[in-house]
Amino acid sequence: MDDNSLKEYKTKLGNLSVNDKKMRDLYLRKLALGEIQGPPTGYASIDKPWLKHYSEDQILKDFEPMSVYQLMYNRNIEHDNEVAIEYFGNKITYGNLLKKIDLTAKSLLELGVKKGDVVLISMPNTPEAEYLFYAVNKIGAVANCIDPRSGIESFNDEINNFNIKFYFGVDVIYDKIKNISSDIKIINISVFDSMPIVIKQIAKLKNKEPIIDSRTIKWNDFLKLGKKSTINSIKAEYEANKLSAIVHTGGTTGTPKGVMLTNEEMNGLIYQMMYGYSEFKRGQKFLNFMPTFIALGLNNSTHLSACFGLHSVMIPSFEPEDMPELLLKYKPNIFLCGPMHLPIIMRNEKVKKADLSFLEIICSGGEKLPLNIQESFQQFLKEHNAPANMWIGYGATETSAGIACMKNNCFKFESVGVPYLKNNISLYDTELEEEIRGYNKSGEIRINAPTIMNGYSGKNANETDDVISIDEFNNKWYHTGDIGHLSEDGLIYIDGRIKQIIMRKAFKIYPQIIEKIILKHPAVKSCAVVGVSDEEEFRIPVANIVLKPNFLGNKEIEKSVIDYVDNIINDELPEYCSMAGYNFLEKLPLTPIGKVDFKSLEKIGIINGKKRKLVKSKFSIN
């Protein structure tokens, strides 16, 4: 298909009605399954080979526009007695959850919060955080969720950006927060407020409450406003394409940005999960430790859990080392995790002896899951009677946390799964700025989806156009910045990030290729290859390696790893891929949300300060 024919064909597709697009998707599904014959174009965004993994009924589903509160309400109004939240043993039913949200909504109105106001919320994972999110949404206001660990400057930026008048936050940061603008009403919330009485009393004896000023009120006093209210009922507010929440990016390669999400964008992910994944069932127990100030926590954990009618076990404070104990204590059917959690689980002596048949869905996300860990954990699950497969998911804050995920009917190691039901994917050559034709060819992953953000907020607003483009048919495309490829079956594979590509002189080095080599050494626990500035070569690759505990500090093992990597590069890769330096660390630095902090690693440089010479390889460029 030449350029003119392709353009004409795309124009024809762009002018199809909504119903005609569905009919075409059914045709593409049959084409991908081999049920009918026809000439595919070779362009992923046109052929959509991933549709073979969805049923005809799923493809024909529509999304009903409504607020996030209304969707959650509709899904649970007839399930009053089922458990919605478990918090330190205190179980809150869906009936009580809806009542708590109503009371919170009345209290917000009595406090003076109005439709369209932005409310600043800085909370760990507690029931109050969930009540607030849905109550704020119910009255037509916007929840701006910010990490409690943020500096006071970040809080003031949000206050100034949105003219915020109301702040709800955890009391342990009150000494910091009391210095914000004097015009702000502060509501202090304790992580103990929803604990069972005995646990609450013990916890309060061990922890002093902060002394508050006159403009600050406690959560329970705030709720008294709603109890005294003369408002009988509150109609759920909904207006198309209005903001529902602001969450913040993880800041792995820069400072966190505020991401504005609408009701449609947040619900878009939930609808796609509801219609595309039969593995989720009402009443399943979900281990919920992702914080609500990130999209993965607010949308893909809290909102998803409530809309699916799951039994959400809320964990307000979490360290990776806690995972084995939490698994054995609560026996969840579902949990989301990061790659760092899996080795900790496999090493734990109690878990090694446990029956894990309760585990039905496990999904790793946030960053790439090394193949050796995925294979090991899949085998570990099998040996411990768990029916779950080790899924990998793929998303971004800018897409309401979701782009793609594995399904049990298309499970493949290293793949991050198939695009969600209504998503479209294209692979782009960023130098030629054109879509790549064919499969298993690397390019930038771009996504058209109902979940793409409204835009960045505040001082980052002008960066929105850097990552979102609008095509000639008014379709919004998010440029992920990830390099990946698509298989003929429509499965996505991540090869790296554009920002992490290392330009050494005129040559591109993809860090994940080197990281795969390093991780194959039996003494290596984890690693990250980063580019470090260099006057002669622009950027040079440096490997940061963490050895397994019994090898830490062993110089002979360190040398064996270096020799191993050098030899493979010499045999299999061009010489410009040879490492300019090796750093052996006790652990990799992490961002506040647990991702590898590449900026910190770049600043470390080469610890001994000695840049290694190029290792001459069989593919020498000189």
List the predicted regions and their residue ranges.
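Conserved AMP-binding/adenylate-forming core of the ANL superfamily
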Residues: 81-112, 117-126, 130-134, 151-156, ...
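Conserved AMP-binding A3 loop
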Residues: 93-95, 235, 244-271
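AMP-binding/adenylate-forming catalytic core of the ANL superfamily
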Residues: 129, 150, 167-169, 335, ...
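Conserved AMP-binding/adenylation subdomain of ANL enzymes
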Residues: 140, 267-285, 293-336, 344-349
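Conserved pre-ATP/AMP-binding loop-to-beta segment of ANL
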Residues: 209-248, 255, 279-285
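Gly/Ser/Thr-rich phosphate-binding loop
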Residues: 333-337, 346-413, 424
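Conserved ATP/PPi-binding loop(s) of AMP-dependent carboxylate-activating enzymes
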Residues: 418-422, 433-470, 507-509
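Conserved C-terminal "lid"/linker of ANL adenylate-forming enzymes
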Residues: 502, 528-533, 542-546, 565-622
